[in-house]
Amino acid sequence: ASRAGNVWAVTALLAAKAAFGKADLTMALNGCLAGLVAITAGPDTPSPLAATFIGGLGGALVVGSIVTLDKLKIDDPVGAISVHGTVGLLGLLAVPFTNSDASISGQLIGGATIFVWVFVTSFLTFKLIGFVMPVRVSDEEEEMGSDIAECGLEAYPEFKA
C-alpha cells in the first residue's frame, strides 16, 4: 500500500509539472492520498509491480480529474471527489486484474451502488442541514473569505490574490 501511495505522489507531481509548468505540492499530496484510497479496494492481492502500475496510473488520473472538475465548475476545493470518487473507482476496477475471484461486472455494480448510496444520503443530509442553517456562505462572505467571515482572521495571510 505504501508503494502505491509513494508512486502516486511522484506521478501526480510529475503530471502537475507537465500540465501546469511547475510542481504542485497539493497535487502530490492528493496523489499520495489517492494511492492509498485506490489500493484499499484490494490491498492483499496486487504484486509490488501491480501496485506500482496502479499507482502510476492513478497519479496522473487524480490530476486530470481535478482539472476536469475545475473546468466543469464543480465546487471541490480540496479534490475530494477526484481522490475518493474517481480514483476510488479506479481502485475498484483494478481489483479483478489482481484477484481472480473478483469480476469487472461485480465491481461496476458495487461502484454504482456506492455512488447511489453516497449521492442519496449526502443529498438528504445537506437538505436537512439546509433547514437548520445555510449550507453555503453568502456571496459577500465568499468574496471576503470564509476564514475572515467565520473566524475573524486570515488563515493564509501570505497568499494574496
Pin down the residues of each PLM region.
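Glycine- and aromatic-enriched membrane alpha-helices
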Residues: A1-A161
